[in-house]
Amino acid sequence: KLTIKDIVDITGGLVIGYPSAVVNGVSIDSRLIDKNQLFVPIKAKRNGHDFVSDAIRNGACCHLFSEGKPQGNAVKVNDTLIALQDLAKFERKRITGDVIGVTGSVGKTTTKDILFASLRNLTEVHVSKLSFNNELGLPLTILSAETSTKHLILEMGARGPGQIAELAKIA
C-alpha cells in the first residue's frame, strides 16, 4: 500500500488532491479496476486518458496522467508508462524474496508455469498472470506481489534488441 504522497515521491510527479489517500493496487484497465486502486492510463491503440472517468466511477481512488485534466485525486507525470515502471522498481526493492527471471525465444510461459507448480505448495510464490512479459505486464506483476513473497517468478519477453536489459532493470 502506498499513499499518493509516496507515488509523487517515487515518480517525481505533482499531486492534485489529497496526498494522504492510500492506494491499494494498480490497474491499467478501467473496466477491471478494484476499489481504491491507482489507475494508470497508457497510450496505446486507445488512449487510456480517455477512460479516467470510467476508472474513477469503477472505484479508482487516484489516477496518473500526462495529458488532459485531473479528475479527483491525481498525480501529474511526464510519462505514465515510465511512472508505472518507477513504481514497480520501488516495490521490487521492498520484496525481500528471490526473483526468478524467465527469458528465451520459446517456452517462457510453460517454464514459468512449471516453476510455479513446483514451488506453490512449498513456499509463498507470486507469478505473472498469463504472459505478462513486457514493459507493461512485468511492472503489473511486481506491483501485484506481496512484500512477503519468497519467490517472484517474472517472465520477460523481447520484441527487439535491449528490451530484456530494460526489463531486468525493473526486475
Regions found by a protein language model. Give the residues of each.
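N-terminal leader/targeting and accessory segments in enzymes
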Residues: 1-86
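Phosphate-binding loop of NTP-binding sites
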Residues: 84-171
